[in-house]
């Protein structure tokens, strides 16, 4: 969906919140060769992996990676983006018992989004507007049953239009997108 929103030669600025190993940001930069991006991540280990991946994909000159608890390392007045993407932790804390051991071996900070799985989406919904240009886009990966709740969080702010959910190839809700009207 995101790639269909922009022309291949678009000169846009992308922010990836909870970038982890940089997969989403680096993939977007691969397909948008004139774009530049910033990835912010609280985990030093994940950020180190993102730096390795950035070097591997020869995108260091277009990527800035920062250790940050969500938006804390950014200056809202001086940091404006055309697109904000995020695959935040979204598993409900109570669902840990349903996960395989392989998943549970992952750092819990990367998995759990609070009691209802929406803690990070609340922050994203309230804060993204500070860092988006007018008519900027957001795209958040979600859990299979979180589309309506995440859409409602965005609607409550009154800052977004064209709020919708994109399904994955299996027909499951996967990404919520919207346009910032600030």
Where are these regions (language model features)?
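Conserved SAM/SAH cofactor-binding pocket of Class I
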Residues: 1-96
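Mobile active-site "lid"/loop adjacent to the S-adenosyl-L-methionine
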Residues: 90-119
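S-adenosylmethionine
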Residues: 81-82, 101, 152, 159
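C-terminal beta-strand of the catalytic ATP-binding
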Residues: 88-90, 179-182
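Short, well-ordered coil/turn elements that cap or connect secondary structure elements
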Residues: 9, 32, 58-60, 106, ...
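Conserved Class I SAM-dependent methyltransferase catalytic core
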Residues: 115-180
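Class I S-adenosylmethionine-dependent transferase superfamily signal
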Residues: 28, 102, 124-128
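N-terminal/domain-start segments enriched in small and hydrophobic, helix-friendly residues
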Residues: 9-11, 80-83, 107, 142, ...
